Design a protein with these regions (language model features):
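Membrane-lumen/periplasm interface segments of specific transmembrane helices
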Residues: 26, 40, 50, 57, ...
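Transmembrane-helix motifs of polytopic, lipid-linked glycan transferases
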Residues: 91-120, 164-167
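Signature aromatic-anchored transmembrane alpha helix within multi-pass, membrane-resident enzymes
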Residues: 13-20, 125-129, 217-224, 353-385
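Perimembrane helix-loop-helix junctions
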Residues: 194-224
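Start-transfer (signal-anchor) and selected internal transmembrane alpha helices
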Residues: 1-25, 110-113, 123-131, 210-219
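Hydrophobic/aromatic-rich transmembrane helices and adjacent perimembrane loops
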Residues: 98, 102, 310-356
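Specific aromatic-rich, kink-prone transmembrane helix
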Residues: 107-110, 137-140, 156-181, 198, ...
Length: 480
């Protein structure tokens, strides 16, 4: 039932290749058509540029007052990836994100393979349909597609280390397991909390393996220590006024400690807020219900039969649903990608132990079908905010830019030498980020840029102080 025997043998590299093309059609096409934005690709690409020159980014790209970008998100991936910016330019982070997801899919393949074969990896040329369907489920998961449709984010890359963490721990390759622990932590200041919950959940699975338990305990101690040092010491020292991440939970407190205290002292309200719209805005109505339904249909329902793995999702759900930012509640953007490795690996690890053949087959065949259907729904009909033209690669509108002539924009961009300072509309800034001074309009006007490049809908009413250099009625280039 699970051995494919076509004339051309299907293997994992065929699946990876097809997924890579599909992901490039999402992410790279969006960038070519100026559907990537200042927040966040422009900001992070400019940070790469700064780090590649051995200096910190001062956040003036989107802030009036200079402050270290690491006080916004403590993201060390940008430092690690910065040399690549000299090779791939503004495409760097998009390529890194695509490659990382494919890397994560290979991790799913390896982990599910050893689960299916009771700890022994299958043949390199294996066409085991069970393992292939796990990969396909992962690559079709809605959180991954929606993340690809919106710029680059380091939590996507961090999540791709999790299947490898599962695999290396299962194989008792503890040095590589430790590498995965570190790589998850350094992505953002909230990643260690997720890591700690992952490792706590795994303790039940490895409860009879004393050595594995010691390594899990070590990972937990590292995660807690990293969280405390970064979130409670380093980031406040970089910006004493506010920790950006905590700004989304202001109603609970101004620090991790205050938020934790609020949760424990208001348990009923906390549980209620996980499911209802607690903001005075109708924009949040139905978003949480939609997300939970999508999560359950995409395999979350099967995870109910592996309850210790539900602990891995607790911090993910909490940071989404307890946030004051309504954008986090829904299925869109990068806010659901971490569920992919947990749910897919959990479901297939559980299915590998099912003795009833008909039940095992039902689960593993249903998973990619359900993941694909949910992703189609989120790309076409979701209530949550999703830029549909960014992710619908089978529609003509994905390959068009209706707001302006892209060839004209590229012509204007070539007129701006790299040494000049520029303030620009959001969609232009990722392409202008490889320079010392680039600013997001309109906040960047306070930095007195030499040139201003705007879309027509960003055009200010008063342009008397600006000298028009060129326009086609859709895009304007000014000198100041």
């Amino acid at each position: 039932m699970f051995s494919f025997k076509p004339h051309i043998k299907l293997n994992k590299w065929h699946i990876i290749g097809v997924a890579g093309v599909a992901y490039a059609l999402i992410s790279i096409v969006n960038h070519v058509l100026f559907r990537t934005y200042g927040l966040d690709l422009g900001l992070y690409t400019h940070a790469l540029y700064d780090y590649s020159h051995l200096r910190f980014d001062d956040s003036t790209f989107f802030q009036e007052t200079p402050r270290n970008l690491l006080s916004d998100h403590f993201d060390l991936y940008l430092v690690l990836f910065s040399p690549l910016v000299w090779i791939m330019g503004s495409y760097t982070l998009l390529v890194v994100q695509i490659v990382s997801i494919l890397f994560g899919a290979l991790g799913v393949y390896r982990f599910v393979d050893v689960c299916r074969n009771n700890g022994n990896a299958g043949s390199e040329n294996s066409t085991n349909g069970f393992v292939m369907l796990a990969m396909v489920s992962f690559l079709l998961f809605f959180g991954i597609w929606d993340a690809l449709g919106f710029d680059y984010h380091s939590n996507v890359v961090a999540a791709m280390w999790v299947p490898w963490l599962f695999y290396w721990l299962r194989q008792e390759r503890y040095g590589l397991y430790a590498l995965a622990v570190v790589m998850v932590c350094i992505a953002k200041e909230n990643m260690p909390l997720w890591l700690v919950c992952i490792l706590l959940a795994l303790m039940w699975d490895y409860r009879r393996n004393r050595r594995a338990l010691l390594w899990l305990a070590g990972g937990i101690l590292f995660g807690v220590g990293y969280l405390v040092v970064v979130a409670m010491v380093v980031m406040p020292s970089l910006n004493p006024e506010e920790i950006h991440f905590m700004g989304k939970f202001k109603y609970m407190g101004d620090s991790f400690g205050e938020v934790a205290a609020w949760i424990f002292s208001h348990p009923l309200e906390t549980v209620r807020n996980l499911f209802v719209n607690f903001r005075d805005s109708h924009r949040g109505d139905g978003l949480k219900t939609e997300f939970y339904l999508c999560l359950l249909v995409s395999g979350g329902l099967f995870c109910l039969f592996k309850p210790n793995w539900l602990l891995m999702m607790v911090p993910l759900v909490a940071q989404k649903m307890l946030s004051e930012d309504i954008a986090l509640w829904g299925v869109g953007s990068q806010y659901s990608v971490e569920f992919a490795p947990v749910i897919v690996c959990g479901v297939f690890a559980m299915a590998a132990k099912v003795k009833k053949t008909w039940l095992r087959r039902t689960v593993v065949i249903a998973m990619p079908l359900l993941c694909g259907l949910v992703t189609w729904y989120t790309c076409t009909d979701a209530k949550a905010w999703v830029q549909r033209e960014n992710v619908r690669i089978f529609y003509k509108d994905h390959y068009r830019q209706e707001q302006f002539d892209t060839d004209y924009v590229r012509k204007v961009l070539k007129q701006l030498p790299p040494e000049v300072s520029v303030c620009a509309s959001s969609c232009f800034t990722p392409h202008l980020a490889m320079r010392d001074s680039v600013y997001l309009y309109p906040v960047g006007m306070c930095h007195n840029p030499e040139y201003i490049m705007l879309k027509s809908d960003d055009l200010p009413e008063d342009t008397a102080s600006l000298t028009l250099i060129e326009t086609n009625g859709e895009v304007y280039l000014f000198h100041r």
